[in-house]
Amino acid sequence: MPPPVLIPDARTLDGLATEVPGAVRSLAAAFWPGALTLIVKAQPTLTWDLGETRGTVALRVPDHPLALALLRRTGPLAVSSANRTGRPAATTAADAAEQLGEAIAVVLDGGPTPGNAPSTIVDATGDRLRVIRLGAIPLAELRAVADVLGPDEPREPAHDEPAAGSAEATGGADAPGDGR
């Protein structure tokens, strides 16, 4: 999964993403600013080194006045959670400074986080929108806005790929090219 990129508002979506489905725009309108991260196809002109993202970008508009003010001045920022691997996310600036120590140069203290539920992450890069992490926004609320698969629901095959378990997918006797 690509690292999250915080943006100041939904207008930034088209500058960083391509092929944005209407359902993604509906989710953004309903839940941004807020705890919704949307994974979309990245603009080919996006040349940031975000690691191996497979041509995607994860976007979120935070619901915090200090973060939004910073983003309006700086533009989009790739971020990470303020914690060490395996430790709970920091909920105060002091927690973040204690966990990250000399690995960070600056800590902005905007007060304690309003809750410790992570953002809900929706992958919009496939044929159907799919929740890949449930978080602060429940699946039912997402589904009130858009057709979204839950994290445990099976993915439907694309129109040009065989269904899982079919003879064609498993190389069974009825599969094309089996030489019989």
Regions found by a protein language model. Give the residues of each.
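Active-site-adjacent structural elements in enzyme catalytic cores
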Residues: 1-180
